[in-house]
Regions:
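N-terminal leader/targeting and assembly helices and adjacent pre-domain segments
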Residues: 1-181
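Acidic, glycine-rich two-metal-ion catalytic cores of nucleic acid-processing enzymes
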Residues: 177-181, 185-263
């Protein structure tokens, strides 16, 4: 039986996804706690309309809006940017190390000098060092944007539910729904960004080492899109603007887990 290919860091993708999931679950927990403390009094158990709830304050709408502003501030404090950046940095260092180990294996296979191909972007190689910094900033921004979208959408959901007479159950469903949507977004980020980072690190190392061509390799499972199944095993030039998937290297198309094998 042929040995299963291991050119894509699936475990690192899943680790990245799990870490983002943990962040999102913290957001969900914070949301539920805030709702119980600051907004619970404005809703009923779901059997009465809004004007039956305990909100005798004639300025209840303004009070809710003020509470939702406070919600934004509270959520911003759930994790600071350094926490997110630290997570992203750990992920990217791991992807880089995976790429580095692959490069060393190719070095042994073809007999090239290890120093030529085994470049570490965190150890003084200017081009890769700059790429690393940019990728960390990009992914930190992606997670922060995902968080802000989660907060903004929940504020709208909660206000509309209260305004339309929704009960606790309705708001609980809204929180769960938004959390589920955000978890799926995290899955997309982990998959897409892992493939892109690996692709670009591998391509730079390979071309720096003198390789001009690569073989497109897929994961050879049921998730591989038909187009990439057809590309699997075919040879392309790194500098061909129409090669690969319309000029994109393996791993660069959205949600692509394919990888390049330099030859």
């Amino acid at each position: 039986m042929a040995k299963k290919r291991n050119g894509y860091p699936l475990k690192l993708e899943r680790w990245y996804e799990r870490k983002m999931d943990q962040l999102i679950r913290q957001w969900q927990k914070q949301t539920n706690q805030f709702f119980q403390v600051h907004l619970r009094a404005y809703v009923t158990g779901g059997t009465k309309v809004l004007h039956d709830a305990a909100n005798d304050d004639p300025n209840w709408a303004n009070s809710i809006q003020q509470s939702l502003k406070l919600f934004s501030l509270a959520m911003d404090d759930t994790q600071d940017e350094r926490t997110i950046e630290s997570l992203v940095t750990r992920w990217l260092i791991s992807v880089n190390n995976f790429s580095l180990q692959k490069a060393k294996r190719y070095t042994v296979t073809v007999g090239k000098e290890e120093g030529t191909i085994a470049l570490n972007p965190l150890m003084g190689e200017t081009v890769l060092s700059n790429y690393t910094k940019g990728k960390i900033a990009e992914n930190t921004a992606l997670i922060k944007t995902m968080k802000h979208r989660y907060i903004d959408q929940l504020k709208t959901d909660i206000y509309q539910n209260i305004n339309h007479g929704g009960g606790v159950t309705d708001i609980s469903h809204a929180i769960n729904y938004r959390t589920g949507m955000t978890l799926r977004h995290a899955t997309l980020i982990a998959n897409d960004q892992t493939g892109k980072a690996l692709s670009q690190l591998d391509a730079y190392r390979s071309q720096k080492a003198g390789y001009t061509k690569y073989v497109w390799r897929s994961m050879e499972d049921g998730r591989v899109r038909p187009k990439h199944q057809k590309l699997d095993g075919k040879t392309f030039s790194y500098n061909d603007p129409s090669g690969g998937d319309n000029g994109l290297l393996p791993g660069e198309p959205i949600r692509c887990r394919c990888y390049a094998e330099p030859i």
